A protein has these predicted regions:
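Conserved ABC ATPase "signature" region
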Residues: 74-89
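Hydrophobic anchor residue at the start of the ABC signature
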Residues: 107
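A short, proline-enriched helix->beta-strand linker immediately N-terminal to the Walker B motif
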Residues: 112-116
Length: 192
């Protein structure tokens, strides 16, 4: 988990050194199109407000990453929707769902192509505290069951209990008008 001050909107982590692990030497020489393809295959995203396409059913939204990567669809949408408690919503458009149901559909979409990493940006910001707790616990449980590295950026300190490891941004500097750069942070493993 990345815990950021409440005054910070977007921010950027800039590498200070080292090399990424397990991505191969070609990664360092990749152009932006190759990097985009790599991200599409290896990273699932959960956006703050879900980011579902409003003209696609929940089923089609969940299947979208698999369709784009030309992976077989199978029963992935049904399985993930069932695990997230939204199976009855599969044939509805996002506008017909509650905020919490839309966020669970977004989580299913992020997991649908079985990426090794899922990045969730404020996944519970628009949800009431009770449902935020449920969704966070569910996301953490699914990430553990599916062996996915889950990175959550949030202002919500109460979500830290679900994290195995937390980066706490103490000092944030403006890099430009639209983003922030973390200049100092501490890494804290969570107590068992």
């Amino acid at each position: 988990m990345i815990l950021k001050p409440t005054s910070v909107g977007r921010f950027v982590f800039s590498p200070l050194g080292g090399e990424p692990l397990d991505v191969g030497a070609a990664w360092r020489r990749a152009d932006s199109d190759e990097m985009s393809g790599w991200r599409s295959r290896h990273i699932g995203y959960v956006l703050q407000h879900g980011g579902l396409l409003p003209y696609l059913t929940v089923r089609r939204n969940i299947e979208l990453p698999r369709r784009l990567l030309e992976l077989p669809l199978g029963r992935v949408a049904e399985d993930l929707a069932g695990r997230l408690g939204i199976r009855q919503q599969l044939d509805k458009l996002p506008a017909a769902l509650s905020v919490g149901q839309r966020q669970r559909a977004a989580i299913a979409r992020a997991l649908a192509h079985e990426p090794p990493v899922v990045i969730a940006d404020e996944p519970t910001a628009a949800i009431d505290p009770l449902n935020a707790e449920r969704i966070t616990a569910l996301l953490a449980r699914l990430a553990d069951e599916l062996k996915v590295t889950l990175i959550v950026a949030s202002h919500a300190q109460d979500l830290m209990r679900h994290a195995g490891f937390t980066l706490i941004a103490h000092q944030i500097e403006a890099a430009d008008e639209e983003s922030m750069t973390v200049s100092v942070c501490s890494a804290e493993p969570m107590a068992a």
